[in-house]
Amino acid sequence: MVAMGVTAAMACASLVAAPIVAQAQSKTQANQQKDVQVIAFQQTWNTIAKECTNTYGPEGVAYVEVSPPQESIQGTQWWTSYQPVSYKLDSKLGTEAEFKNMVQQCSAAGVGIIADVVLNQTTGADVAAGDQKGVAGSEYNGSTGSYPGFATKQYPDGITAADFHSCTKNISDYTNQKEVQECRLSSMWDFNSESEKVQDIQSDYLASLWNAGVRGFRMDAVKHIHTDSVKAIKEKFAKKIGKNANDIYWIQEVIGNASEAAGIQPSNYVQNGTVTEFGFKSEMNQTFKDKIANLKGLSDRLSKDLSSDDANVFVTNWDTARNEGALTYKDGAKYQLANAFMLAYDYGTPRLLSDYKWDVNDNGAPGATATSVPDVDMDKACSTNDSDWNCEQRWTSTRGMIAFRNYVNGTKVADWQDDGGDNIAFSRGAKGFIAINNGKKDKDASYTTSLADGEYCNVYATMDCSKTVTVKGGKVETTVPAHSAIALYAGATKASHPAASAATDPSDPDVSQEEDDALPDDRSV
């Protein structure tokens, strides 16, 4: 959420490609349940609007989460978006009009918008004295705690120092709940979330997002706000839009740590909505760098803290990617395979990251200035795997696994198989089957599956069904290439799979070097 450092911009690729037509919205899948979310990190509203039409809608994505849409401090770094100076819907990612157009365009494509919402804090207090201006021109004074840009009809003076908690020290003791929820996170002014005034202003902001068409809310740094205050803000918001608070989709960022205060643990927040399950991220990082066979029983382990229905899972997000302890695009095939596992598994609601390439953790989006981020033509940027953008949402494996997940939703993991090391396989009821080889050698194996006999498309590897796997007598006799997977589902057979304009997407990362030492393995699974 918060960082300090240097920014750099990278040049955009120059090739242009037409949007890839892929399999996700075939008639065999149109009625399947959708739950996949994509985090479109630091992407402008115009960029996302077009990508909803070209990619997210056709591929069956349920929601796209956008970076904080409110006005923030100036700066090229990505984390400036997390320091609001007003709740105006004018940010470096676009204007209010562009934001509303994006929501409409995505809705027309069947994709809901989740807004990343920052309610815990404003800006850093350790700044030079004097007035500053936000990206949309709102004046504020971070040294005195004066933020007139938060003004509403009810509170025309906006936010003053009296509207923040009195504690001025930085949080250091996470065993002390009061300190965590009333002192400053990285020197930023901490809203007095118990205040009626603060709750009124913040619930007005949430209502403005709802009225713009937003249908999901990811609450940033919510462990720093007391659960009772979160509940009060949500209920005020619900009343203003005429909804039941329980009917509002609410995702809460709570990083669990057993050594911290009991009152800030994830389980305390499920009364208000779903919670991000950081334990899943840690499991992905540990197992894909060690033995993925250790993923056996993962759902049982994680469910001790959060039920599947309460958990939002991810391999990485923008924060964890820029810190230790998470897989990222820099991990090559491991990152792809971990995302495939997440989409194939039956625990939690999956969240994929669509990110840009970076060398310095603080770097903003390519081409970012202190007040704006340029629009990106993803058709152009994703026409190569050497772009400034990773284009994870367009990778062949991503497209195939979203389709897989939408088809198998509602079924449970069955037929778990592993070799104690780098190879696992499991079915999703009688609807799907996946085998993952995280090893350096090809894996020859005979797997058990609940899929019916037939010839199935390997949707992890191709979009046009040019690679198939046969199921016969409840068995899959196949070779899983090193650092790869096979993913089969009943809606994608050789006979029923719709046509695609290409076998693979040009944005696919090059993992050939990782596969150079691939050699045949045994049939021990």
Predicted stretch roles:
Residues 94, 197-201, 334:
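Short secondary-structure boundary/capping elements
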Residues 498-525:
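Ser/Thr/Gly/Pro-rich low-complexity, disordered linker/stalk segments of secreted
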Residues 37-47, 188-199:
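Active-site mouth loops of central-metabolism enzymes
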Residues 31-35, 72-104, 141, 146-192:
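Aromatic- and acidic-residue-enriched carbohydrate-binding clefts of CAZyme catalytic domains
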Residues 127-149:
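Flexible, glycine-rich active-site loops centered on histidine and acidic residues
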Residues 1-23:
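Secretory targeting and sorting signals
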Residues 27-38, 45, 50-57, 61, ...:
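Active-site-proximal helices and loops of the catalytic beta/alpha 8
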